[in-house]
Amino acid sequence: MVDVCLLGTGGMMPLPDRWLSALLVRCEGHVVLLDCGEGTQISWRYTGWSFRDLDAIVFTHLHADHVAGLPGILYALAFADRQEPVRIIGPVGTAQVVAALRSIVPTLPFPVETLELSGTSELELPGGLLLRALPVTHRIPCFAYTLHRPRGRRFDPQRAQALGIPMTLWHRLQRGETVEFAGQLLTPDLVLGPPRRGITVAFVTDTRPTPELPGFVAGADLLVCEGMYGDTALLPRAIERGHMLMQEAAELARAASVERLWLTHFSPSLTDPEAWLPAIRAIFPASEIGPVHQTVTLRYRDA
């Protein structure tokens, strides 16, 4: 299972009743933070999640409302007695931004590692999560991300017994290893069922719709997507500034056949996002305004 918790739904600047958009994802006790705008550590403290469990911080892009909260988060980790390395991942320029922000938190009890992405990427994170990155269309380099938790194939003990495979080898086959027994090579396919769907969380913000996005987030259990404006008359502004309308987020969710959509990253001018939900749900019924500070658990589905 995978836990998710949205830390805010704001874009551009925090407001008295709206924190900036950021997302926590937890699997097997390991936490990933997607974006880290001003005030992220304050919003985090409403959740009950442990700072010490944070292994990776992932930036979509390097605008201030997505990175300026980094010094506070690093301080929070230090006071939580974090000693293990923390990885910071983002587009080209991330190392320079991290170095600048770290100048006011120069001494930390843990190493900080940076990794810059320059194109479509895939890498493993702690907790068995697979991070995928897709370049999207904003005013500066920006990425959409998915975090995927694979699910192992089901082991068939009756089949293993029928083949005379000793129980001492079962766990290796279940892990996907090929083993040798009685002069034969035994492959996992002999005793494992068909592939099973895992759990996928998609995070898309600060972009115009692109042809690649529906396939990239296809079938996600949860799509967290920006809806900068609700008024379709503001489409020219969205195009100019590299953002999506709430309606465009819903159209993406529908095209990608995701399970549910959380809308986030609202313009400060969008004072009542809830007012637009009827129109949004007419496009994609499983849409909601992102629930801030609520931990939601995503579980494996057999289908």
Swiss-Prot record:
Keywords for this protein: Endonuclease, Hydrolase, Metal-binding, Nuclease, tRNA processing, Zinc
Gene3D superfamilies membership: Ribonuclease Z/Hydroxyacylglutathione hydrolase-like
Family named by the database record: Belongs to the RNase Z family.
Catalytic activity: Endonucleolytic cleavage of RNA, removing extra 3' nucleotides from tRNA precursor, generating 3' termini of tRNAs. A 3'-hydroxy group is left at the tRNA terminus and a 5'-phosphoryl group is left at the trailer molecule
Name of the protein described by the UniProt record: Ribonuclease Z
Cofactor note: Binds 2 Zn(2+) ions.
Pfam families listed in its UniProt record: Lactamase_B_2 (PF12706)
Active-site annotation: 65 (proton acceptor)
HAMAP family: RNase_Z_BN
InterPro entries for the chain: Metallo-B-lactamas, RibonucZ/Hydroxyglut_hydro, RNase_Z/BN
Source organism (scientific name): Thermomicrobium roseum (strain ATCC 27502 / DSM 5159 / P-2)
Gene: rnz
Taxonomic path: Bacteria, Pseudomonadati, Thermomicrobiota, Thermomicrobia, Thermomicrobiales
